[in-house]
Amino acid sequence: MPPAEASRGADEPDRGAYAQPTPRLLYVHDDLSDEVAERLGPASPAAALTRSLFALLKRDPERVVVLTLAEQVERVIAQGRHAPFDLALGIGRAGERVAQALHAKTGWFPRVHRLGLTREEDGRGDYHLVSTVPATLAAQLAGRLKGFPASESLAVVDDTVFSGLTLRSVLETLPPVVLPRTHVFCLRGVSDSIAAVARLCPVTVGVAGVGRMLEDVSFINASGLVLRVGIRRRARPPLAFFERPQWIRAWFPGRDREVIAACRRLNALLDSGG
């Protein structure tokens, strides 16, 4: 019998609907190394396995680029200075962390509030934006912006602009009087999606991948490879990327079995606390 980790997503009826091509350039954001070291220690077996996993991912340096938080933050800062914003809205935990990391270097975001949002597969090949808290996006924004003067500045902060679904939804739900004084900040994104967001308000991005989304350029988080946070599905348990072997084959052809095995072992270590 195959391990539970291997079989968890094997019978998915929707797997073909979310096929991934092999991109010409794949960016992998390392949001895993520091977390593993902090949780289990830099000398732990899990930390050693994490280093081995990244060495494996980097075997194709012409096509796979590993990004660190620090270098992306510096690239955002290099785009130009800003006066402190009156309010910053971080999209999800990731956006909140980006806002905090930027503020630590610049002082731009003295007030940061999180919006509870995530993207979810609908099982039919599409994605929908859903709240992770018991309030709609409109209700969350109404609460955060209650009494917010139209003269004050607003920052909306996320980690990635991929399809642009999340950011466009947030911006289009903002009160019209607030949008003209809104600025988006993001660590990385697909250039065409960034351009679509920029039609709504100014955008500052650290790393912009040029070309067609998925085919030419793609972005993934390393945490999603290992932890069951990468794939969220409507009314079904979340999956890690390694539980969709066809995705790993597309992203890391020729070494997909090694990547899956390393991710599975690391997932087990993190689940067991060892």
Question: For each predicted feature, which ranges?
Answer:
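Short, glycine/charge-rich flexible loops or terminal/linker lids adjacent to PRPP-binding catalytic cores
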Residues: 107-153, 164-168
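Glycine-rich phosphate-binding "P-loop"
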Residues: 49-68, 157-159
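A short, well-structured juxtamembrane/interface segment
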Residues: 59-85
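Cofactor-binding loop segments of dinucleotide-utilizing enzymes, especially the Rossmann-like FAD-
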Residues: 91-93, 117, 186-189
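PRPP-dependent phosphoribosyltransferase catalytic core
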Residues: 2-57, 83-84, 101, 105-108, ...
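Short acidic, S/G/P-rich loop/turn micro-motifs used as interaction or catalytic elements
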Residues: 95, 160-165
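Structural motif
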Residues: 87, 153-155
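Short glycine-rich phosphate-binding loop at a beta-alpha junction
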Residues: 84-92
